[in-house]
């Protein structure tokens, strides 16, 4: 009987405190309300997700289009630290996503300092995504990532 080499998931589909099931990449299904409250709920959800038996948190730090232009302001040090701590404590790697150009260099640097490992991904949203690693390469340079910072499947 075979096994998967690794497991990954994201926090882009969840039910908010009002009971609304959301897919964050679909504006018609997303309910933001107060952006600060939304972010607190999102980080709570990310922390829950990375306690599951997964290896990689993908599409990390993704924000819906409605608030994406507030990324740096909404991803506060406190929120970053909560997420990074959960990743480190659970041994979950963080994807550097070329399609969405996330997470930010600030987040990557904090995660690296905490011992979090990294992977690269594209989200395979279309032909333009495949084989593109421009953002990952940019972050390798900007954050001083080395092969030792990368996540590798066991076995």
Predicted feature residues:
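Charged catalytic cores and adjacent phosphate/nucleic-acid-binding surfaces used
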Residues: 71-155
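Extended substrate/RNA-proximal surfaces in nucleic-acid metabolism proteins
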Residues: 1-89, 141
């Amino acid at each position: 009987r075979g096994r998967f080499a690794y497991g990954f998931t994201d926090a882009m589909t969840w039910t908010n405190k009002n009971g609304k099931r959301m897919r964050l990449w679909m504006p018609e299904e997303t309910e933001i309300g107060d952006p600060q409250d939304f972010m607190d709920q999102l980080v709570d959800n990310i922390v829950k997700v990375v306690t599951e038996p997964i290896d990689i948190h993908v599409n990390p730090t993704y924000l819906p289009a409605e608030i994406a232009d507030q990324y740096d302001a909404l991803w506060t040090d406190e929120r970053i630290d909560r997420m990074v701590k959960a990743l480190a404590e659970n041994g979950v790697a963080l994807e550097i996503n070329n399609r969405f150009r996330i997470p930010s260099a600030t987040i990557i640097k904090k995660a690296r300092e905490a011992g979090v490992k990294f992977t690269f991904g594209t989200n395979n949203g279309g032909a333009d995504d495949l084989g593109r690693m421009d953002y990952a390469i940019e972050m390798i340079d900007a954050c001083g990532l080395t092969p030792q910072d990368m996540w590798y499947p066991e076995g």
